[in-house]
Each structure stands twice: as C-alpha cells, then as structure tokens.
Amino acid sequence: MNSFSTSAFGPVAFSLGLLLVLPAAFPAPVPPGEDSKDVAAPHRQPLTSSERIDKQIRYILDGISALRKETCNKSNMCESSKEALAENNLNLPKMAEKDGCFQSGFNEETCLVKIITGLLEFEVYLEYLQNRFESSEEQARAVQMSTKVLIQFLQKKAKNLDAITTPDPTTNASLLTKLQAQNQWLQDMTTHLILRSFKEFLQSSLRALRQM
C-alpha cells in the first residue's frame, strides 16, 4: 500500500492546530458562582455557537486541502477520466434540493438534519482514510476527530434529533472491509473521491449554516 507524505501542511503543525480547535468543544470548567463570561480573556468576546461551527468547518477544509494536494501530486487521480467507475461503487453523501440547504427552498431544520446525517455517514469513509496516509497519519486523524467535534456542535444546535439517521455499525464495518479489499488503483481513486466529495459537502454545509 502506497503512502502519502505531507510537506506543505506538516503533521506537527496540523496537530497543533487541532489542539487549538478541539478545546472549544470541551470548555474549561467554570469555578462555582462564576459565569463563563467573567473568566473569558479580557477584551475578547467568546465565540458564539455559529462562529465556532464556522471556524471548525474551515479548519477541516484546510486539512482536506492538504491531503488532497498529496493525493493529486502522487498520481493523476485528480484528472482521471475513469472516476465514474469508482464513484458508482460509493454512496457518498450529497446535497439535493429536497434537503433544504440551497437558497431556493431553504429550510433551516431540514438542512441541519441533512448536514448532521451526512457527516455521520462520512465517518466510515474518514475511517478508511486512516489507512491511506501512513506518513500523514496525524493529519488524517485530525480531520476525523475534528469532524466528530463538528457533529457535536451541530447536534446541540438541532431541535429534532430524532430525525437524524445514524448509520448501522454492521453495515459500516462491511463497507470498510470492502473498500480495503479493493485493488491499489481503486483504493487510490476511492481516496481521491472521498476527499473531493467531503470537501464539496462541507462547502455546501458552510454556505447553508451561514444563513441560519
């Protein structure tokens, strides 16, 4: 199995970035009798929920861009005309008109449910990526963990958690095994398609969330 190595976006720098973003999901305890605003840094307003979500998505997108760069530099996968062959074997989440995330027919709650459900569906594909970047393992791991934090942020924002569909663990395990059993070319193409689709999904999500 080939591995990718990152130069422009080093693993150490990416991991340090993760440490800066993840604490937002787990704020430091506030002493009894004190309000969190009272212990905030002077002259700095604490980030709102929407600002944290926006920042988290942009951080993940930076990580995806770094991994995609390595994928594209390694081979011609980003230019391949045979993408459809591999893409037909995947069921990557995509935005559709019925999801209420586009400007036409925008519906905040319907869209939010779609975003969370889509991110949950992407998790098995992000797990697959952990075995595709041996020399950039920390970057791939950071994207995966940051996505989990993003899901937590969004679940707190959602009003109808019952409408969110959670993927079946057994089905995910079977899918992961199937993806890992592909030949080398298909594994490389799958990696490219996952990163590209995840980037597009997050970009669409970011535009929609900025309307909420």
Swiss-Prot record:
Matches recorded under InterPro entries: 4_helix_cytokine-like_core, IL-6-like, IL-6/GCSF/MGF, IL6/GCSF/MGF_CS
One Gene Ontology MF term: interleukin-6 receptor binding
Family affiliation: Belongs to the IL-6 superfamily.
Subunit organization: Component of a hexamer of two molecules each of IL6, IL6R and IL6ST; first binds to IL6R to associate with the signaling subunit IL6ST. Interacts with IL6R (via the N-terminal ectodomain); this interaction may be affected by IL6R-binding with SORL1, hence decreasing IL6 cis signaling. Interacts with SORL1 (via the N-terminal ectodomain); this interaction leads to IL6 internalization and lysosomal degradation. May form a trimeric complex with the soluble SORL1 ectodomain and soluble IL6R receptor; this interaction might stabilize circulating IL6, hence promoting IL6 trans signaling.
Inducing or repressing factors: Plasma levels are highly increased upon exercise, due to enhanced production by contracting skeletal muscles. Up-regulated by coagulation factor Xa (F10) in PAR-1 (F2R)-dependent manner in cardiac fibroblasts.
Summary of the tissues where the protein is detected: Produced by skeletal muscle.
Disease (UniProt): Rheumatoid arthritis systemic juvenile: An inflammatory articular disorder with systemic onset beginning before the age of 16. It represents a subgroup of juvenile arthritis associated with severe extraarticular features and occasionally fatal complications. During active phases of the disorder, patients display a typical daily spiking fever, an evanescent macular rash, lymphadenopathy, hepatosplenomegaly, serositis, myalgia and arthritis. A IL6 promoter polymorphism is associated with a lifetime risk of development of Kaposi sarcoma in HIV-infected men.
Keywords: Acute phase, Cytokine, Disulfide bond, Glycoprotein, Growth factor, Phosphoprotein, Secreted, Signal
Top-rank taxon, per record: Eukaryota
Keyword NADP (UniProt): no
Modification Phosphoserine, positions: S81
Function: Cytokine with a wide variety of biological functions in immunity, tissue regeneration, and metabolism. Binds to IL6R, then the complex associates to the signaling subunit IL6ST/gp130 to trigger the intracellular IL6-signaling pathway. The interaction with the membrane-bound IL6R and IL6ST stimulates 'classic signaling', whereas the binding of IL6 and soluble IL6R to IL6ST stimulates 'trans-signaling'. Alternatively, 'cluster signaling' occurs when membrane-bound IL6:IL6R complexes on transmitter cells activate IL6ST receptors on neighboring receiver cells.
Residues carrying sugar: N73
Signal peptide: 1-29
Protein name, as recorded: Interleukin-6
Organism this protein belongs to: Homo sapiens (Human)
Statement: the UniProt record of this protein carries the keyword Phosphoprotein: yes
Subcellular location as annotated: Secreted
An individual GO BP term: positive regulation of extracellular matrix disassembly
Xref: Pfam families: IL6
GO cellular component terms, A-Z: endoplasmic reticulum lumen; extracellular region; extracellular space; interleukin-6 receptor complex
Disulfide cross-links: C72-C78, C101-C111
Free-text description of this protein's post-translational modifications in UniProt: N- and O-glycosylated.
